[in-house]
Amino acid sequence: MKKKTEILDAASIQRALTRMSHEILEKNKGGENLVLIGIKTRGVPLAKRIQQKIKQIESIEVPLGELDITMYRDDLDKVSEQEDPKINSVSIGMDITDKHVILIDDVLFTGRTVRAAMDAVMDVGRPSTIQLGSLVDRGHRELPIRADYVGKNIPTSDREIVVVQLSEQDQEDRVSLYEK
C-alpha cells in the first residue's frame, strides 16, 4: 500500500466533529431523546468525542453505547478459514425505544456495515429514528444508505483505501488516502 495524501489532520477532524455535533443538535432540536452508538472499532471513540462536544454545547450528557456488528455482517463467508469470526451478543447498555439513535462510524463505503448495525439496533429495541454520522463518506454504495452527518466527502476509486487513525487507538489523529 502506498500513501497518496493526507486528507484530514487532527485540527480538521476536530472541526468536522464539532460541525457534525451542531448538525445533530439542530436536526433533533437539542439533545433530549438522543442516543449515540459508536460502531466498533473507530466509531466508538468518534461517538465519545461527539458526546463530549454536545455536552460542551448543550450542557447535557447524551447516552453513549457501543455496537459490535460482527455477527450481523453479510460477508462472513469471505472471512478466511483461519479467522474464526467472534460471536458477540448485542448489548448497547440502554433502552433505545422511542429514542433518536445516531449511529457513528469512521468511513462510509458500501453501506454494508451500516445495514448490519441497523439490524443489530432493531434487535435491541425500536427507536423513533435511526440516523447516521460518518467522519468520511467515500462513495461506492452497494446499498441505498446515506449519512445524515458527514465530516468530509472524499470521492475515491476502487483502488484507493481510506485509513482513519485516532489518538485513542493509533496515537495520532489523521485520515489518509492510500493506493492498493
Swiss-Prot record:
Keyword Ribonucleoprotein: no
SUPFAM superfamilies membership: PRTase-like (SSF53271)
Record bears the keyword Membrane: no
A GO biological process held by the record: DNA-templated transcription termination
Alphabetized InterPro entries for the sequence: PRibTrfase_dom (IPR000836), PRTase-like (IPR029057), PyrR (IPR023050), PyrR_bifunctional (IPR050137)
Record field: catalytic activity: UMP + diphosphate = 5-phospho-alpha-D-ribose 1-diphosphate + uracil
Gene3D superfamilies tied to this protein: 3.40.50.2020
Top-level taxon in the UniProt lineage: Bacteria
EC number of this enzyme: 2.4.2.9
Short sequence motif PRPP-binding: positions: 101-113
Function recorded in the entry: Regulates transcriptional attenuation of the pyrimidine nucleotide (pyr) operon by binding in a uridine-dependent manner to specific sites on pyr mRNA. This disrupts an antiterminator hairpin in the RNA and favors formation of a downstream transcription terminator, leading to a reduced expression of downstream genes. Also displays a weak uracil phosphoribosyltransferase activity which is not physiologically significant.
Family recorded in the similarity comment: Belongs to the purine/pyrimidine phosphoribosyltransferase family. PyrR subfamily.
Record note on quaternary structure: Homodimer and homohexamer; in equilibrium.
Annotated protein name in UniProt: Bifunctional protein PyrR
Organism: Oceanobacillus iheyensis (strain DSM 14371 / CIP 107618 / JCM 11309 / KCTC 3954 / HTE831)
Encoding gene (name): pyrR
